[in-house]
Amino acid sequence: MLSSLSPYMANPRQTFTQVLNFALVLSTAFMLWKGLSVYTNSASPIVVVLSGSMEPAFQRGDLLFLWNRSPRVDVGEIVVYNVRGKDIPIVHRVMRTFPDVPGKDKTKKGGKQDVEASPSSLESQKLLTKGDNNLSDDTELYARGQDYLDRKEDIVGSVRGYIPAVGYVTIMLSEHPWLKSVLLGFMGLMVILQRE
């Protein structure tokens, strides 16, 4: 087995070049992802639909493109949110919006006298969501004690476009962990066997 690797060990410069090329591909992909994250103002600018709760609008495996630069979300808009304490993105439609203007919290304590809260602190928005294919709203999905989603804290982004079925590869990799090993092994083998 080691004798089959001897041509690669005989020329360390070529081996080093292949390793650098592989590192370049990985770092370029990472930079593109981070650049897209900054441009869209979303930690996850691209997500995959994991369930059928949004059918017929989106099918399981659809790849969604998100935008999170709008200060407000409108009723009927499709958003992606994360439940607090869980790391699974949920894609659902906004059914109702509520301005977050607390009744008794309009002033903040500031020493001896009360100080009016700034307008930016009152501009938060509460949202109630529901999957198109679900019978009830998402209050059962939210974190314990949470009745609404907070626009600034919970929303990953609003859906601006999609490509059907492309994301099904990631679902297959999640459901069958052995496929990840096969894919990584294949990629590693291609890097080793590639000659320039």
Curated annotation (Swiss-Prot):
CDD domains: S26_SPase_I (cd06530). It is found in: Endoplasmic reticulum membrane. Residues 34-196 are lumenal. Residues 101-133 are annotated as: Disordered. Residues 182-193 are annotated as: C-terminal short (CTS) helix. Residues 118-133 have a biased composition (Polar residues). The keyword Cell wall biogenesis/degradation does not apply. The keyword Hydrolase applies. Keywords: Endoplasmic reticulum, Glycoprotein, Hydrolase, Membrane, Protease, Signal-anchor, Transmembrane, Transmembrane helix. Its main location: endoplasmic reticulum. It catalyses: Cleavage of hydrophobic, N-terminal signal or leader sequences from secreted and periplasmic proteins. The C-terminal short (CTS) helix is essential for catalytic activity. It may be accommodated as a transmembrane helix in the thinned membrane environment of the complex, similarly to the signal peptide in the complex substrates. Component of the signal peptidase complex (SPC) composed of a catalytic subunit SEC11 and three accessory subunits SPC1, SPC2 and SPC3. The complex induces a local thinning of the ER membrane which is used to measure the length of the signal peptide (SP) h-region of protein substrates. This ensures the selectivity of the complex towards h-regions shorter than 18-20 amino acids. SPC associates with the translocon complex. Catalytic component of the signal peptidase complex (SPC) which catalyzes the cleavage of N-terminal signal sequences from nascent proteins as they are translocated into the lumen of the endoplasmic reticulum. Specifically cleaves N-terminal signal peptides that contain a hydrophobic alpha-helix (h-region) shorter than 18-20 amino acids. PANTHER family: SIGNAL PEPTIDASE COMPLEX CATALYTIC SUBUNIT SEC11. This is Signal peptidase complex catalytic subunit SEC11. It comes from Blastomyces gilchristii (strain SLH14081).
